[in-house]
Regions:
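Active-site/ligand-binding-proximal alpha/beta "capping" segment
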Residues: 90-122, 130
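Arginine/glycine-rich "motif VI" loop of SF2 helicases in the C-terminal RecA-like domain
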Residues: 53, 120-127, 153-154
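A cross-family phosphate/adenosyl-ligand binding-site feature
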Residues: 1-96, 134-178
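Short loop-to-beta-strand entry elements in the cores of soluble alpha/beta enzymes
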Residues: 127-135
Length: 178
C-alpha cells in the first residue's frame, strides 16, 4: 500500500510527536508498505523517511523545484519526484497515495490534508483520510467539522471517510481494512 503522509519540516515542541513519527515510519517500512511524503530531510519529514528506510521500506519524496534549489531534499530516498510548484506536488502526492495520514503540522500540512478531505467528502477519492490527533492536536478541526454538520453545511455521510485517531494501533486498524 502506498501511504501518503503529510507533516512538517519542523520538529515541533512536543517530544511525543517525534516518537509517533518514528513509530509510524518504522511500521510502514517493516510491513512492506511504501511511504510517499514531501521529500525533505528536515524536521519531522526527514525523521519519518529515515525511520521507514531504516526499517527496510521504500520511500518516494515529492518536492517542488524551489526546495531542490535550497538543497532540502533527503538524499537517501528510493525515488525523488521534482514538481514545478506546491500545487503540482499536492496533486502528485494524491495520485500516488492509497491512504492519507496527516500528523500535526503547520499551514502546509493543513492545506494538503484539506484537499484530501474535500476529495473524499465529494466521492472523488475512495481512500482512508486519517488525521493523527496526537494529544488532541486536531480537536478544534474535528469540532469545526461537527459544526458544519450541525449547521447543515455538511453531512455525516460526506465526512464518514475522514477519521481522527489517537495512536498507531487505530491507524493500522483502518489501513488493514482498506
Amino acid at each position: 500500500m502506498n501511504i501518503t503522509v503529510y507533516l512538517g519540516a519542523n520538529e515541533g515542541s512536543d517530544p511525543a510527536l517525534a516518537a509517533a513519527v518514528r513509530e509510524l515510519g518504522s511500521w510502514i517500512g517493516a510491513n512492506g508498505h511504501h511511504l510517499v511524503y514531501g521529500g525533505s530531510r528536515s524536521g519531522l519529514m526527514g525523521l519519518l523517511a529515515q525511520s521507514a528506510l531504516d526499517a527496510g521500506g521504500t520511500v518516494t519524496g515529492v518536492e517542488p523545484q524551489f526546495f531542490i534549489q535550497q538543497e532540502l531534499q533527503h538524499d537517501g530516498l528510493t525515488e525523488l519526484i521534482v514538481t514545478r510548484d506546491m500545487a503540482e506536488r499536492k496533486t502528485k502526492m494524491i495520485e500516488l497515495g492509497d491512504a492519507f495520514i496527516a500528523f500535526p503540522g503547520g499551514t502546509g500540512t493543513l492545506e494538503e490534508i484539506a484537499e484530501v478531505m474535500s476529495r473524499v467528502s465529494l466521492g472523488q477519492l475512495d481512500a482512508p483520510c486519517i488525521l493523527y490527533d496526537l494529544n488532541g492536536y486536531y480537536d478544534s478541526l474535528k469540532a469545526l467539522l461537527d459544526k458544519m454538520i450541525e449547521k447543515g453545511l455538511s453531512t455525516p455521510q460526506r465526512q464518514r471517510g475522514i477519521r481522527f485517531v489517537a495512536n498507531l494501533e487505530e491507524i493500522t486498524t483502518i489501513l488493514n481494512k482498506a
